[in-house]
Amino acid sequence: MKNKFRKYILIILLLSSSFAECDYAIGDFNNDDVLNVLDIIALVNNIIDEDEFSIVFDLNFDLVNNIADIIILVNRIIDSYPQEIAIEEIDYDFETLTISWNQSTDYGFEYYNINYFNIISQESEIIYTSSSISDTSINLLDFALKEQNWFYISVVDFLGCETSGNQFYYELPFKHYEVDDNGDVYDSEISVTDFQNSTDCQGCHESHYEEWSNSMHSYSMNSPVFFSYKNETLENHPEVGDKFCSQCHNPIAYLTNTNLEEYDSVESLQSSQLPNVIKEGIGCDVCHTTTSLSETIFTDNSGAANAMYKLYPGENIKFGPIENPLENGFHNSYYLPTYTSSNMCLPCHDLVVRDVEAEITFTEWDRIPGFSMFGGVACQVCHMPEKEDGTHDHGFIGADLDLNIPYMSNPEYEKVVNLMNAAVTMEFDVWGIQLPEIINSGDSLLVPLTVESITAHNIPSGTSFNRDVWVELKVSSNNEIIYSSGLLQNNSELLNYNDENLLSFKTYLLDENGDTTRSVIDAHDIINNSLSPYAQRFKQYNIHIPDNISGEISVQARMLFRPFSPDFILNHHPSFIENLPIYEMFVINSIIEVE
């Protein structure tokens, strides 16, 4: 709703500068600044009494003064503006734009204007003008249409008055389908054969392919953790569970109504006779056949899938963010500005279940004041950063890694570390209260801590209920810890959430009984302790300094991020526990003298 409101505001601004001004001096034959019956009398008298043609009285510019001019004037006195007409149909094949409209019958007609404006590129122009009243359609060749297009036709009369018809909204072509109450797709224009394997792209786009191969998009159908969740969801919700998962984790299977219920493991799916585009999970064509914007997934009480993708596969056109792409012998290329916007991450990265905002990374970004309207930092800036050669990284860097391999060996690990290091800052200061430089032994040490987000979505985000994010605080003397909160001995140790001083950013999903759950489809409520974009969280620790401490003490605070709470991994895939990383997002240290 908010996005639609923004669109309409922009539309009003664009329309406000597009109308022609009326010149009422034309037809005002008695010069009284009003079109009325006196002007009709003057025109009639001229036609009756004058033998010679007068251009002043020729309102339809046919070089004759006659009854037609009288009709035009009478019509305009009765109705101050030209007759309103409307665009009836628009068709586009990514080369030719065809527009048809109903014909004007206005007696004062001078010409049509077809006006075009685009929400994303903010283009606004008259794309066609015709002085023939009988024109009702036009074919515009090589017209590069974008997403979110608005058209309207206006009629201009002999006075220069302009009347605009209703706006006609036109999305780029995409293939349609319907979804039933169980989340199964039917009446689909999309087939499996419409999609190309990602390996087909490798020859020309080798670096993109290699990056994708190591990404979580590629991992979606190679993740034992995903299959554990899928099997549990399917067991508890046999009617809707399969498509609930595949609508995001395997969009091609979802869109082609390919049933994945029988495949309960990576091995069973990858060894099957299913097409490779389904085994790939989220391949190149899932994104690069997108032509229009999708919306957040809202799932009702049944849990049935209802993701709406707007794709145009199987037409040998690949869409992307490169303006004026070079021609090649393999496919047509088409530039769309949406590919640099956060909207491209819909529908998958925004899921609401029973009004519970379960996984809403896009919404978190969209709620930042001014971001979506005025072009804040898009998802791609951080998660698909531009490389030295001008192309963008297709590793889709995020918090998660392939748990099949040691995280230090994962080629994406350093990228994730760099991403985490750029997400938050911390300081020992809360509204001017700072750490002391000197303290007496036996006293209480007040440690003021401010954590500040410098990223454009919550921390944690996505499946935030799976993640552990917290502050580890240590106070040490001579390398011996005299106080700690959030300190773990290893990456697989469980956090002590009973520690009243633990500064945690944990999110919990609650089921219908109010118990915690990791099953998204069973979410009935949420406790969200995550850190909002560009927000701050404050904490003050009161720590007793023992009487026997002297010299210096060190205070260290670390913001830590574990992409998965280890209990689920230990219960389902214990062999992965050593591959579970903990990222250090930020660290600060201070030394205090003890007297």
Regions found by a protein language model. Name each.
Residues 175-192, 209-236, 261-516, 520-522, ...:
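Primarily the internal scaffold of c-type cytochrome electron-transfer domains
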